[in-house]
UniProtKB/Swiss-Prot annotation:
The keyword Nucleotide-binding appears for this protein: no
Originating gene: PCMP-E72
PPR repeat ranges per the UniProt record: 88-118, 122-156, 157-191, 192-222, 223-257, 258-292, 293-327, 328-358, 359-393, 398-432, 433-467, 468-498, 499-533, 534-569, 570-600
Family of this protein: Belongs to the PPR family. PCMP-E subfamily.
GO molecular function: RNA binding
Pfam families associated with the record: E_motif, PPR, PPR_2
Record keywords: Repeat
Biological processes, Gene Ontology terms: mitochondria-nucleus signaling pathway; RNA modification
Region (Type E motif): 605-680
Segments of this protein annotated with the region Type E(+) motif: 681-711
Protein name (Swiss-Prot/TrEMBL): Putative pentatricopeptide repeat-containing protein At1g17630
């Protein structure tokens, strides 16, 4: 009764806002005070007290109870009426923090801007407003506030500097690393773990792992975050060796790796192509008793796809189910790719169909799986399904999707379809990336489609991809294969950091078009530039020697491969030297090389020797080679037709007819080759038998005119006359 009477009397002199608030707080389910009368009396006593400490605890308690914007603003009103906010930086800081927690950034900023100037020297106030901005992604605002703070002569402390360093990291202001590092040293915070860890995180983002390592070594105290930052930093630099050294050092210092540590180690080895090591470290992670993260599983399954290690992936698949990672899409998508790449597309599709909310990454995983398994029709069907789903669930094909489809068509020899999908991709306003561009340039090189290749080159320049080494190499290859070596050479010379592929592309280009001396010159220049030639480079230069008839130079390169370059000749190299010797008539030497090969000769080697026998009408060697080829390629007609032509050239018509009859008896059919020609930006495809009778009268006079010009040129470098092959031109 006493409390009730007192409440009725004092209610009359408390402002209406505060009365409402008293009732509001008394009804709050989280308050520990059950009696509204007690709350009201306590409230009034606190408001009329001159004890700042009591007021602070009272308002701080109320702020802790606030769950809504209305409640927080009512407490704010009480604080303003008490004038206490102008005396307490701590209370203002707490009020800012509560507003920020509720997402009311404008209210938080309003509190900060209305405090007295005296309180602006309180670092707690600055910390609260900076934290409010950084936690809500307003990084520019945070940096602007920090500049204002510095202009007032204030220096950041161990709470403020980590916030500013985090803002710099997210904004990409990596150039400020050194400035803040100096500031940390000047204000004596170089031993503050939170500050140094944030600085340690910023350096790798700036690509300055050397500075990060020096800072790390100087740290008197480290925690697990310090070690993880360094391992992840080296991982992003593709420096597996350094990442492993830090990882081993961490364990020597008795820090146990956690999920973040293991995931960084796995990612590092995966990015560096050290797939076997990924399996090793994944096993060690499981043996250590650490919980396996979804990210680690995604990396592991991606590596299983690369290694085609389906059996290993299947064992861990059970862990995914038991560990509750089935709904974690990155690991599920990687698992889809594992099954798909191994040809188990039904299992891959089953996993895909189980996903309830499919993102574009899931669609891409299955489409890529179909493409890798050579099931192009299924990939295109799924792509069409995705296009239809776009209208239902707003999942749209991205650059990865389009590139997979374009690549799939190209691999299956459907270059025209690839270009059509590329046009559709452009129409859909999806920007091509470097992988897409390289794929299209490869198609342009194979068709060839020079005009489109030039258009792509223009696109590369406009989109600032001209410094991408993959794109530059693809351009060199495209121009070289299309016969425009002058343009290819210009692109090649413009490459600042040439790699082995750059050199191989230009050497091959010169060689295939008969510029052997230029190809050899570029080969020597490559070696003098410090590059060690690989097998592809040696194939290119040997092929150049073959086309130009440079026998001695070709012999020199071939027989010095092992001693000079540390490379043992492979099938392709043997094919080149056999072709070189065979073209100039050294059939016996070429035949001996084939007989003495350390491995069984494959089709490329035997085919080169058989073709040389055709050139020089050598039936004896040809018969044995054709017999070997028919065993290696029982369903191909090539060796039969070549042997038949050799018999015909030697006047042995009966044997020629017998060979053709044998091919017919085995029901072997010649697969017609196709050719493309580009006229006025339009490509035309034609093959043997595709020309109708009415077009003969137009085509053959032109063909005969070309042959007559070739005959006037006389014999080729290998001593053969074009007239010997006239039957092939008119067949």
């Amino acid at each position: 009764m006493v409390h009730a009477s007192l409440w009725q009397f004092r209610l009359q002199i408390i402002p209406w806002r505060l009365r409402n608030f008293c009732f509001l707080t008394s009804q709050c389910p989280y308050t520990s005070i059950s009696s509204p009368d007690t709350v009201s009396v306590s409230s009034y006593y606190s408001l009329t007290s001159n004890n700042d400490q009591s007021l602070f605890h009272y308002f701080d308690h109320l702020l802790g109870l606030c769950l809504t914007a209305q409640q927080c603003r009512q407490v704010h009103a009480q604080v303003l009426l008490s004038d206490f906010i102008f005396r307490s930086g701590s209370l203002a800081a707490n009020l800012i923090s509560v507003y920020a927690r509720l997402g009311l950034l404008l209210d938080a900023r309003n509190v900060f801007e209305t405090v007295s100037l005296v309180l602006l020297s309180d670092l707690r106030l600055w910390n609260s407003i900076l934290k409010a901005n950084v936690s809500h992604g307003l990084y520019e605002n945070a940096l602007e506030l920090y500049r204002g703070m510095r202009q007032r002569g204030l220096t950041g402390d161990g709470y403020i500097l980590p916030l500013i360093l985090r803002a710099c990291r997210y904004l990409g202001r990596f150039g400020l690393c050194r400035a803040f590092h100096t500031q940390v040293i000047q204000i004596g915070l170089k031993e503050n773990l939170h500050v140094v860890n944030e600085l340690l995180t910023l350096y790798p983002k700036a690509g300055r792992m050397g500075d990060a390592y020096n800072l790390f070594v100087e740290m008197p105290v480290r925690n697990r975050m310090s070690w993880n930052v360094m391992i992840k930093g080296f991982s992003q630099e593709y420096d597996c060796e350094s990442a492993v050294k830090i990882f081993e050092w961490m364990q020597r210092e008795e820090f146990k790796p956690d999920e973040v540590t293991w995931t960084s180690v796995l990612s590092c080895h995966s990015q560096c192509g050290k797939f076997e090591d990924v399996l090793k470290y994944f096993h060690l992670m499981r043996m250590s008793g650490n919980a396996v993260s979804g990210e680690a599983l995604a990396v592991f399954f991606s590596v299983c796809a690369e290694l085609e290690a389906l059996s290993i992936a299947e064992k861990v698949h059970g862990y995914v189910i038991k560990g509750g990672f089935e709904e974690y899409l990155p690991s599920r998508n990687a698992l889809i790719h594992v099954y798909g790449k191994q040809g188990k597309v039904k299992d891959a599709e089953h996993l895909f169909r189980q996903i309830r909310n499919k993102g574009i990454e899931s669609w891409n995983s299955l489409i890529t799986s179909f493409v890798d398994a050579g099931k192009l029709d299924e990939a295109l069907s799924l792509f069409s399904e995705l296009e239809e789903m776009n209208h239902v669930c707003n999942v749209k094909a991205n650059v990865v999707t389009w590139t997979s489809v374009i690549k799939g068509c190209n691999v299956q020899g459907r270059g025209d379809d690839s270009l059509e999908y590329f046009r559709q991709m452009q129409f859909s306003k999806v920007l091509a990336n470097s992988v897409t561009i390289c794929c299209i340039l490869s198609i342009c090189a194979e068709l060839p489609a020079l005009n489109l290749g030039r258009e792509i080159h223009g696109h590369v320049i406009r989109t600032s991809m001209s410094e991408n080494i993959l794109v530059q190499n693809a351009l060199v290859n495209m121009y070289a294969k299309c016969g425009l070596l002058s343009e290819g050479s210009l692109v090649f010379e413009a490459i600042r950091d040439k790699d082995l592929i750059s050199w191989n592309s230009i050497i091959k280009g010169y060689g295939m078009h008969g510029f052997a001396e230029k190809a050899l010159s570029m080969f020597d220049r490559m070696i003098s530039s410090g590059f060690h030639p690989d097998g592809i480079a040696l194939v290119a230069v040997l092929s150049a020697c073959s086309h130009a008839g440079l026998v001695e130079k070709g012999r020199e390169i071939f027989y010095s491969m092992s001693k000079r370059f540390g490379l043992e000749p492979q099938q392709e190299h043997y094919a080149c030297i056999v072709d070189l010797l065979g073209r100039v008539g050294f059939l016996k030497e070429a035949s001996e090389i084939v007989k003495n090969m350390p491995m069984e000769p494959k089709v490329c080697v035997l085919g080169a020797l058989l073709n040389s026998c055709r050139m020089h009408k050598n039936v004896d060697i040809a018969e044995g080679i054709a017999s070997q080829l028919s065993v290696l390629e029982p369903e191909r007609t090539g060796s039969y037709m070549l042997l038949s032509n050799i018999y015909s050239a030697g006047g042995r018509w009966e044997e020629s007819a017998n060979v053709r009859a044998l091919a017919k008896k085995k029901d072997l059919k010649k697969v017609s080759g196709s050719s493309w020609i580009e006229v006025k930006k339009k490509k035309y495809k034609f093959s043997s038998g595709s020309i109708v009778q009415s077009e003969f009268e137009t085509i053959y006079p032109v063909l005969e005119d070309l042959v007559s010009h070739m005959l006037k040129k006389g014999p080729t470098h290998d001593g053969n006359n074009y007239e010997d092959d006239l039957d092939l031109w008119t067949a």
